[in-house]
């Protein structure tokens, strides 16, 4: 049983779902229906877990080349590729059935798009072919925002898209920080992550570019959602703290990889704090 849970990458799923509940709260202009929230989060967990399980099947030959991923259940033989594929298919179908029966048609469609996009577009088409893989493939990680919003309203507003772009621009610096830390692993697998194929200077410029757009999108989100001005101030401060982490990432520093690891951890903290802020600001407005 543990092996099948590992296939779903529940720690990654948890991070994805951090943005789902805030999106539902913003869409509902308050607390969403409890049953709807539970159904959306559970179905979203299955959908993301399905995509992750398919990813492990497809990338098992690459995973065995990387120390960080060499203990995954398909690589070790704990679970066969065929069993993992069946599992991924079943929980994916179950997630869509749950979305259809307990949420809205649009949320169901978006969940399907998210699974297909992550598996086909990101994993199969982009990841091993371009250094911009995480930029475009990362769009799948933004889908929980749209799914959560659509589960409440069966529509998408500018506020939903603003939240989408916060996650979209957050994703590259988050994953590039991880790729810096595990650069040798990605190189061994032949995965052209930007830190593997580009200079440190180029990587820093790209991380700054996306961080600035992330901060701008977070301001847009607060304004579009018509949240209190105090929440805008806190949002800007969170963004500036994020940017401050990048200042410490210096091209010639012997601590380069260590600092990148700290940025990766802070990026998770940033997204979690922003999500809590959105919920609190909406409930108090």
How should these model regions be labeled?
Residues 68-109, 199-223:
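Multi-pass membrane catalytic core of lipid/isoprenoid biosynthesis enzymes
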Residues 46-54, 116-123, 165-183, 215, ...:
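Transmembrane alpha-helical segments that form the membrane-embedded catalytic/substrate-channel core
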Residues 243-273:
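Interfacial loop-to-transmembrane junctions
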Residues 146-156, 214-221, 270-285:
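Hydrophobic alpha-helical transmembrane segments in multi-pass integral membrane proteins
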Residues 1, 58-79, 176-203:
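Cytosolic, membrane-interface loops and tails of multi-pass inner-membrane proteins
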Residues 18-21, 72-73, 135-152, 201-202, ...:
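Small-residue-rich segments of transmembrane alpha-helices in multi-pass membrane proteins
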Residues 81-152:
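Intramembrane alpha-helical segments
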Residues 18-60, 68, 97, 109-120, ...:
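Membrane-embedded alpha-helical segments that form the functional core of polytopic membrane enzymes
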């Amino acid at each position: 049983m543990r092996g099948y849970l590992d296939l779903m990458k529940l720690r990654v799923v948890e991070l994805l779902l951090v943005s789902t509940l805030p999106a539902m709260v913003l869409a509902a202009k308050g607390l969403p229906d409890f049953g709807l929230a539970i159904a959306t989060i559970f179905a979203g967990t299955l959908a993301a877990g399905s995509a992750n399980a398919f990813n492990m099947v497809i990338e098992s030959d690459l995973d065995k080349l990387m120390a960080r991923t060499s203990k995954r259940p398909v690589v070790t033989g704990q679970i066969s590729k065929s069993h993992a594929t069946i599992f991924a298919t079943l929980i994916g179908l179950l997630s869509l059935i749950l979305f259809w029966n307990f949420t809205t048609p649009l949320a169901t469609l978006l969940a399907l798009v998210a699974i297909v996009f992550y598996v086909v577009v990101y994993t199969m088409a982009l990841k091993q072919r371009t250094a911009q893989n995480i930029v475009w493939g990362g769009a799948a990680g933004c889908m929980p925002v749209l799914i959560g919003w659509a589960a409440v309203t069966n529509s998408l507003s500018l506020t939903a898209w603003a939240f989408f772009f916060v996650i979209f621009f957050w994703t590259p610096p988050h994953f590039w920080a991880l790729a810096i830390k595990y650069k040798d692993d990605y190189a061994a697998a032949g995965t052209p992550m930007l830190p593997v194929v580009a200079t440190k200077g180029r990587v820093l410029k790209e991380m700054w570019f996306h961080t600035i757009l992330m901060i701008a999108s977070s301001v847009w989100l607060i304004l579009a959602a018509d949240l209190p001005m105090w929440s805008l101030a806190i949002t800007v401060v969170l963004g500036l703290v994020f940017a401050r982490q990048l200042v410490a990432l210096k091209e010639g520093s012997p601590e380069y990889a260590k600092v990148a690891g700290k940025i990766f951890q802070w990026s998770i903290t940033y997204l979690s704090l922003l999500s809590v802020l959105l919920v609190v600001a909406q409930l108090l407005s």
